[in-house]
Regions:
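Acidic/His metal-coordination segments adjacent to aromatic residues that form catalytic metal sites
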Residues: 2-17, 82-108, 155-162, 173-196
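Amphipathic, well-ordered alpha-helical segments in soluble domains
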Residues: 24-32, 58, 62, 111-118, ...
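Helix-loop segments that flank and shape redox-cofactor active sites
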Residues: 28-50, 115-130
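Domain-scale activation on soluble regions of proteins
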Residues: 31, 65, 92, 120-122, ...
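Internal, conserved structured core segments that host functional sites
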Residues: 93-147
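Extended, helix-rich structural scaffolds rather than catalytic motifs
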Residues: 164-259
Length: 259
């Protein structure tokens, strides 16, 4: 992409756009799966596990479609397990460590609200395959958002300790949200084709939803200035490499192995 004139979409823009959606779900699902057996209570353990399974299921559908769009003979497993960190294009927020339960909930809530708007818009995409995937994912994401926003309310309007942890997580993670609705040449090109939605209306609805949830949870809206992260362009934090080294260990150690 760096060799192209500024603002010019690459020839494989469609593939890259679908891959971004896939990678965000895959990496977030991988992060959530680390809570299995470690959540504060059995109900939350099962809840987070179900969210992780849904996200990985979404990623599989999107990765399979991305592989077909790429047309290089790769499949969902090759895209998931045989790419290096700079080749991933997930939103940077998804790759951040789980931290405590409060940080996990705040991260999940921010991304659930984003996916809720994104999948609702993509369900009417001119790309019928992508629209079908988005329609299925939207049903799951509604549940994800109810789970995370419900827990945000409990934490924010709970004890002094839970509120402090939720507020700290919100302040720390807020700067990563600027990437959600900052369009680049791929977003713009896909929008002109009717594949992707315009991001400005989504940003307005997301902001309204987030502000209402923050107020309901008796939290303060962050004053942190957003930072222009570029996870969807392959620029990541150091945390993604550590996550991938664990996630990809078996396929890379035993190449081509079949169960």
């Amino acid at each position: 992409m760096s060799a192209l004139p500024a603002g010019t979409a690459p020839p494989d823009a469609h593939y890259r756009y679908v891959l971004r959606l896939a990678d965000t779900s895959l990496i977030l699902g991988q992060r959530l799966s680390a809570w299995i057996g470690h959540a504060p209570a059995l109900e939350e353990d099962l809840g987070l596990a179900n969210l992780a399974l849904d996200l990985i299921g979404q990623a599989r559908l999107l990765l399979t479609y991305a592989a077909e769009l790429e047309g290089r003979g790769r499949d969902e497993d090759a895209l998931a397990f045989l790419r290096d960190a700079p080749e991933f294009s997930n939103l940077a927020l998804a790759e951040l460590p789980n931290g405590d339960f409060g940080q996990t909930i705040v991260r999940q809530w921010l991304l659930d609200a984003w996916q809720l708007e994104m999948y609702a818009a993509l369900a009417t995409s001119s790309d019928l395959r992508l629209a079908a995937i988005a329609g299925k994912a939207l049903k799951e994401t509604r549940y994800h958002y109810r789970f995370s926003s419900g827990w945000l309310l409990r934490l924010g309007d709970g004890t002094a300790e839970s509120q402090a942890r939720a507020q700290r997580a919100l302040d720390d993670l807020w700067r990563f949200t600027s990437e959600f609705f900052t369009p680049d040449e791929i977003d713009t090109h896909m929008q002109t084709l009717g594949v992707a939605p315009a991001l400005a209306p989504l940003a307005a609805r997301w902001s309204q939803r987030i502000a209402a949830d923050i107020a309901a949870a008796t939290l303060r809206h962050p004053q942190t200035q957003p930072y222009p992260w570029h996870g969807k362009r392959g620029v990541h934090t150091e945390h993604l490499g550590h996550l991938l080294s664990e996630m990809q260990h078996l396929p890379r150690t035993y190449a081509g192995v079949q169960w």
